[in-house]
Regions:
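Cys/His-rich metal-chelating microdomains
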Residues: 9-11, 29, 58, 76
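Canonical alpha-helical transmembrane segments of integral membrane proteins
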Residues: 298-315, 335-338
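Juxtamembrane amphipathic/hinge helix adjacent to a transmembrane helix
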Residues: 268-291
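Alpha-helical transmembrane segments
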Residues: 337-351
């Protein structure tokens, strides 16, 4: 549905920087609440559904837009499929990050990557699309009576704790195309900015199709609540082993919402790679190429430290420890050297996104990673 300007009847689009509706024809600005909304107060709203013939993803746009590039794989293989009426979301977090800011934060992120090729750090943007991703938000009451095992010098003890926790706006993505790995790494969103849904916010952006029912997510909701509950209880108790008994939980409220994500597609050596940016917090994730020889060199350096330097230091410090009885200091220094090298090595690999399973290429369908969602928010 086209949202018209009351001055000239031109199409209105949502301006991220100002948080207002802007007329593309006369450049007039309107507050979101000022725009006439009587035409779409129903529980359903109409979308144009476009499907990608390369990866199978589907996106929904309003009648103002015409999708020609796939936001997921970056290929110009997207075609109109049908007009569809879909459930209207109750809540939305509008885009706070502009297109320019999204590109800038990705460039900054890649420049910090030691293993990232120079050509990738100086990439040219192929596609940069703003997409509202569908989520289910759950309010959950969870209670349990876990018991803990505590070992002391004078014995082995058990004690029990009873506590109730309320989880507010627990996020679960509602798109088959949007893998759990993507959604977990883009979180958390600041739910204080959650607002009532208005169709005006969709103007100028894509929206992913909602295709996962809330009933399908209930088991994952329970698992996530249990993990967070057990972790929090363990932090506040002395026991090292937390044993759940018979947890009770109930969903107090379920809300369908849309959360903002920027999809940036770049090409390197005839392959497409996609980087994602949280449209509210600027958090970045994605997979990019890496320089293999740098990985090999760092690996060999770490190996050299482990095989040559550390044993040498160990011998000297063992002798020092034997003479002075300060073996704790020796162990701490050796351990610190090893951990520092390993932390640098693994940190750079994670920053670069070496995981090839989430690289998008032109000749293959997007793979949904069958990984368990991280249950604890970062």
């Amino acid at each position: 549905m086209i949202i018209r300007c009351s001055n000239c009847s031109g199409a209105l689009v949502y301006d991220i920087a100002l948080g207002k509706m802007k007329c593309a024809h006369c450049n007039a600005f309107f507050e979101v609440d000022e725009v006439e909304t009587s035409a779409f107060e129903e529980d359903m709203m109409e979308y144009n559904i476009f499907a990608c013939t390369a990866c199978g993803a589907k996106v929904a746009v309003n009648n103002v837009e015409c999708a020609t590039w796939c936001a997921y794989c970056g290929q110009p293989t997207i075609v109109f499929e049908r007009v569809s009426k879909r459930k209207k979301p109750k809540k939305i977090i509008p885009f706070r990050v502009t297109k320019e800011e999204a590109e800038a934060v990705i460039r900054k992120h890649l420049k910090m990557g030691f293993f990232v090729p120079k050509a990738v750090k100086e990439f040219e943007v192929e596609r940069l699309n703003g997409v509202y991703m569908p989520y289910w938000l759950f309010d959950v009451e969870y209670k349990d009576r876990p018991f803990f095992e505590v070992k002391r010098r004078n014995g082995h003890y058990k004690y029990q704790v009873c506590a109730t926790t309320n989880f507010k706006n627990l996020t679960m993505d509602a798109s088959e195309n949007f893998s759990n790995l993507y959604s977990q790494r883009l979180e958390p969103y600041d739910m204080k900015e959650l607002t009532d849904f208005k169709e005006e916010y969709l103007s100028g952006f894509y929206a992913d199709c909602f295709d996962v029912n809330k009933e399908q997510l209930r088991e994952k909701v329970f698992e996530r609540c249990k993990k967070m509950y057990d972790n929090e209880i363990s932090k506040n108790n002395l026991g090292s082993n937390c044993h759940s008994t018979t947890p009770k939980w109930k969903v107090l409220e379920e809300k369908y919402a849309m959360l903002p994500v920027w999809f940036l597609t770049m090409r390197y050596k005839d392959k497409s790679y996609t980087m994602l940016v949280n449209g509210q917090t600027k958090k970045v994730m994605g997979a990019v190429p890496y320089v293999k020889w740098k990985v090999v060199v760092v690996y060999l350096l770490v190996l050299a430290v482990l095989l040559l330097i550390v044993p040498g230091l160990s011998c000297k410090w063992f002798q020092y420890a034997a003479d002075n009885g300060n073996w704790i200091l020796m162990f701490g220094i050796v351990f610190g050297v090893v951990v520092s090298f390993l932390a640098f090595f693994m940190g750079e690999i994670m920053r670069t996104g070496v995981n090839r399973d989430i690289c998008h290429t032109s000749g293959r369908k997007i793979t949904r990673l069958n990984e368990i969602r991280q249950e604890v928010d970062e």
